[in-house]
Each structure stands twice: as C-alpha cells, then as structure tokens.
C-alpha cells in the first residue's frame, strides 16, 4: 500500500477503544467483572498464537524466518509483536486481542481508584517521549496507557454529545486528519510509534474518530439508500467472525504462498509489499469463503476455545 495512504489509515485504529469507552457501563463496572467478561481475549491470543506459531515453525518458508524459534516463542508469550524481525509474522495481528483486555482492565482499575487522570497523563507523556526514545513494554502495557484517553473520550462522547455531527464538523475533522497524517506520519500502536510528534497523533486520532462517527451516522440515517444488502451481508460476516479472520488471514496467505512456491513462483516479503493490491484480495477472498463454508462450532473451536466450550455445554444441557 502506498506509504501516504497507509499512514493516513493508521489513525483509524483509535475508533476501537473509542467504541469500548462508548459502550462502557454508565455506572462503572468491577475489576472482577471485567476480567470475567474479557479474559477470553487473552485465551484467544495464546490459543491462536500457538497454532500460528506451530504453522510458522513447520511450514513457513525459510526466507520468512529471521530469528530462532526460541526467541520467537519468548516474544510471542510476552506479546512483543513490535519486534517484527523476531516474532512470526502471522502472530503480529493478534496483539490487539491482548491489548484490548489490558486497556479495559487498566481503565477500570484506575477509574475505580480515581486515578484515571494520572493514567491518562502518563499515557500522553509516553506519546510525547516516544518521539525522542522508543518505548515498548511487555503485554502492551505502554499502548494501554497511551489509549486510556481514547477510551475515556468514547465514554464522555456518549454522555455529553446528544446531537448528530454536522457536515462542517466532519469536513474539519477530515482536514485535520489528513494534515496530521502528512505532517506527523503514521501512528503505529503495535510498535509504540506515534509519528514524528507524538502529541499530534492524538489530535489526528480524535479527528479520525469524529469523521468516522459522522460517516456512521450518515449511513444509519440513509441505510436503504447507501448500503446495498450484499455489502452489508459481507461486512456483517467479517464482523461476526472477526477474531477468526484476525487470527488466520496471514496464515491463509502463507498457504497460498506455499502453493505458489510449489509451482515455481518466488514470493518474498518485498514482493508482498510491492504488490499489495494483489496480496490483500488474495487473503480476503479465501477468508470470506472460509467463514461462509465452515460451520460456526468449528470456527469457534479454531479461534475462541472458551466460547466453543460454552456452546458445547449449552447443547449438552439442552439434550
């Protein structure tokens, strides 16, 4: 993907913790409840990661192995997915599962102890400091701190914004988003790299959120006119099986690379980057076919073991 477009799109990631904050219970929630509700994300991270790790060890091409298997296993366990050359490439996207659990837990702990402002201030400091010296903590703790403010923004937005966003607000937000992406570069949460000027990334992310919320409001209002039923169906499918897709889309791409290699084609990381417009659909289409054809129990068994256990248990009780 062209660098400028990629850097612009990186700011979209902020919408997800914003949604978590938007959906956060108005009266708060206990730490125990958060752990019980969201610990399945950690289980899915390690479960999917271990499957992908085994695939990388036994099936990946040697050109994609830049470091020993033991070092990669350690980085996988510590969620050091920022170390691109020292962790299996098919594990990297899974960092978000672990991060989402950590940020919601951290937010709840700090909010319940009335220390949220301190945590947000520390997160802003990390963003600014990252422009001077790279910061990367195990288990995505640093990313959780830097995104606390985004989660709180989502909660406050729901609480205080009761009218629809206007067109001029959306255009202004888009302009700010574009400008900051051009000035600051991309914002990569996985690596803890927030661009040339860390504080600008926060402004760019807020602008991206406002624009995306406006788009969502327009789509909701004009649903029959804008969203074709076929497009809505595809998006719904990907949404329902998002963890399965997140966990296996690179592995599916790896299988395709293996097939191409068997017929004499040479595929490298440079090739994948240069021909992104071919790489992306070649992973997207097979993944869509998989989520269409595979039964739900199998998809859960391959990606969300706890949900699979609950499904099996409920069927046993019914019988």
Briefly describe each language-model feature range.
Residues 1-319:
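Alpha-helical transmembrane segments and their immediate juxtamembrane cytosolic regions
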């Amino acid at each position: 993907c062209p660098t400028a477009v990629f850097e612009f799109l990186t700011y979209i990631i902020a919408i997800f913790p914003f949604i978590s904050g938007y959906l956060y219970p108005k009266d708060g929630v206990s730490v125990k409840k958060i752990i019980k509700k969201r610990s399945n994300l950690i289980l899915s991270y390690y479960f999917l990661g271990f499957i992908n790790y085994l695939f990388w060890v036994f099936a990946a091409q040697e050109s994609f192995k830049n470091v020993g298997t033991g070092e990669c296993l350690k980085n996988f366990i510590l969620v050091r997915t920022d170390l691109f050359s020292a962790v299996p490439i098919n594990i990297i996207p899974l960092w978000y599962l672990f991060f989402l659990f950590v940020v919601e837990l951290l937010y709840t702990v700090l909010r319940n102890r009335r220390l949220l402002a301190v945590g947000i201030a520390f997160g802003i400091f990390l963003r600014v400091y990252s422009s001077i010296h790279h910061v990367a903590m195990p288990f995505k703790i640093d990313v959780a701190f830097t995104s606390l403010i985004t989660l709180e923004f989502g909660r406050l937005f729901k609480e205080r914004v009761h009218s629809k966003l206007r067109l001029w607000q959306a255009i202004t937000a888009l302009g700010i988003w574009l400008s900051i992406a051009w000035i600051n570069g991309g914002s990569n949460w996985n690596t803890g790299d927030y661009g040339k000027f860390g504080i600008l990334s926060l402004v760019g992310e807020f602008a991206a959120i406002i624009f995306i919320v406006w788009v969502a409001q327009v789509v909701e209002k004009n649903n029959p006119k804008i969203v074709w039923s076929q497009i809505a169906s595809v998006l719904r499918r990907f949404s329902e099986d998002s963890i399965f897709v997140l966990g296996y889309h690179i592995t599916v791409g790896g299988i395709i690379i293996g097939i191409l290699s068997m017929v004499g084609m040479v595929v490298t990381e440079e090739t994948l980057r240069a021909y992104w417009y071919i790489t992306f659909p070649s992973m997207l289409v097979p993944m869509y076919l998989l989520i269409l054809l595979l039964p739900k129990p199998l998809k859960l068994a391959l990606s969300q073991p706890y949900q699979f256990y609950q499904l099996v248990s409920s069927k046993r009780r019914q019988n």
